[in-house]
Swiss-Prot record:
Protein name from the UniProt record: 6,7-dimethyl-8-ribityllumazine synthase
Transmembrane intervals: none
Name of the top EC class for this enzyme: transferase
Function: Catalyzes the formation of 6,7-dimethyl-8-ribityllumazine by condensation of 5-amino-6-(D-ribitylamino)uracil with 3,4-dihydroxy-2-butanone 4-phosphate. This is the penultimate step in the biosynthesis of riboflavin.
PANTHER family given in the database record: 6,7-DIMETHYL-8-RIBITYLLUMAZINE SYNTHASE, 6,7-DIMETHYL-8-RIBITYLLUMAZINE SYNTHASE DMRL SYNTHASE LUMAZINE SYNTHASE
Organism annotation: Wolbachia sp. subsp. Drosophila simulans (strain wRi)
GO biological process, one term: riboflavin biosynthetic process
Binding residues annotated for 5-amino-6-(D-ribitylamino)uracil, in chain numbering: Y11, T42, F43, E44, C68, V69, I70, M101
Length: 142
């Protein structure tokens, strides 16, 4: 049985709940167990995964990053998006960990809601499927 850590950014609560719902629905249909930790914003996701990887207290087979960044009127959106993607990539490449990336970047809340809804784009569910496939691949290539 695979163990997965879901790191869920709760900055946009409604979107966070939809992402998590889609991910959990997908994981319940698999042979995986999961823990969920909430972080204040999407920017904190890479550090939280790194904390778990380096802690030695937990033994997760894969990680699921869920969050949302919505474009505003300043450059903040670009910096957060870049920081999150680069941070996740760095952790994945350095520690060779399976990851499902369910971080939505959208121009509006309405577009983000469509992507998060499990009955529409289901980004959370797709990210969960990805981490499960990456865990299988990781195990095959060990």
């Amino acid at each position: 049985m695979s163990r997965i850590l879901i790191v869920n950014s709760i900055y946009y609560t409604e979107i966070a709940n939809l992402l998590l719902e889609g991910a959990i629905d997908k994981l319940k249909g698999s042979n995986a167990s999961y823990d969920v930790v909430e972080v204040p914003g999407t920017f904190e996701i890479p550090a939280t995964i790194l904390f778990a990887v380096k802690s030695g207290h937990t033994n997760y087979d894969g990680y699921l990053a869920l969050g949302c960044v919505i474009r505003g009127e300043t450059d903040h959106y670009q910096y957060v998006c870049k920081g999150v993607i680069e941070g996740l990539n760095e952790v994945v490449m350095h520690y060779a960990i399976p990851l499902g990336m369910g971080v939505i970047t959208a121009d509006s809340k309405d577009k983000a809601l469509v992507r998060a809804d499990k009955n529409k784009k289901n980004v959370g569910g797709h990210a969960a499927s990805t981490v499960l496939r990456m865990i299988d691949l990781h195990n095959k290539l060990k």
